[in-house]
């Protein structure tokens, strides 16, 4: 699949996959952003893109940022719809007790292209019964036993 990319800032970098087996590509910051502890920051990527109809871009947390700095994509996965043509931006949340400084060029998130499907919604009076029913939020337990 080919994705058209428009750089709208001189610091913008064209995304690339780091390894042959990578499903995600890195998204790079175009400016410095200081994110205070237990706060969020909006990080600009400096690119716009054009996806094929039937696909979306999911913006996901980089595992190293989560593990080493407790910094995550707040709405992970963030969705970039195929008809959006604006600048890609990432909402980062700093869950740590320390300031987190994003530097120009830092790989702050990863993008994954995913197929999308349109559902047809059918209103009904009652849903089919299942053994689970309406149980949720831990209703199936957490232990193996």
Swiss-Prot record:
Keyword RNA-binding: no
Coiled-coil regions, chain positions: none
Annotated pathway: Pyrimidine metabolism; dUMP biosynthesis; dUMP from dCTP (dUTP route): step 2/2
GO molecular function, one term: magnesium ion binding
Swiss-Prot/TrEMBL GO biological process terms: dUMP biosynthetic process; dUTP catabolic process
Entries under CDD domains matching the protein: trimeric_dUTPase
The keyword Iron-sulfur appears for this protein: no
Protein residues bound to substrate: 62-64, 75, 79-81, 89
Keywords associated with the record: Hydrolase, Magnesium, Metal-binding, Nucleotide metabolism
Cofactors, names only: Mg(2+)
Superkingdom: Bacteria
Pfam family, one: dUTPase
Catalyzed reactions per annotation: dUTP + H2O = dUMP + diphosphate + H(+)
The enzyme's E.C. designation: 3.6.1.23
EC main group: hydrolase
Family affiliation: Belongs to the dUTPase family.
NCBIfam families: dut, PRK00601.1
Main function: This enzyme is involved in nucleotide metabolism: it produces dUMP, the immediate precursor of thymidine nucleotides and it decreases the intracellular concentration of dUTP so that uracil cannot be incorporated into DNA.
Record-linked HAMAP family: dUTPase_bact (MF_00116)
Protein name: Deoxyuridine 5'-triphosphate nucleotidohydrolase
Species of the source: Helicobacter pylori (strain Shi470)
């Amino acid at each position: 699949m080919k994705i058209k990319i428009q750089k709208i800032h001189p610091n913008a970098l064209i995304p690339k996959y780091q390894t042959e087996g990578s499903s995600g590509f890195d998204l790079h910051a175009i400016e410095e952003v200081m994110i205070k502890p237990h706060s969020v920051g909006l990080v600009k990527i400096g690119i716009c893109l054009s996806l094929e109809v039937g696909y979306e871009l999911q913006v996901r947390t980089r595992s190293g940022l989560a593990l080493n700095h407790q910094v995550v994509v707040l709405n992970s996965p963030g969705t970039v719809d195929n008809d959006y043509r604006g600048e890609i931006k990432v909402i980062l949340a700093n869950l740590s007790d320390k300031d987190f400084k994003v530097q120009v060029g830092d790989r702050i998130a990863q993008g994954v292209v995913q197929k999308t499907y349109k559902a047809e919604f059918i209103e009904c009076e009652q849903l089919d019964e299942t053994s689970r029913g309406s149980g949720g939020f831990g209703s199936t337990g957490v232990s193996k036993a």
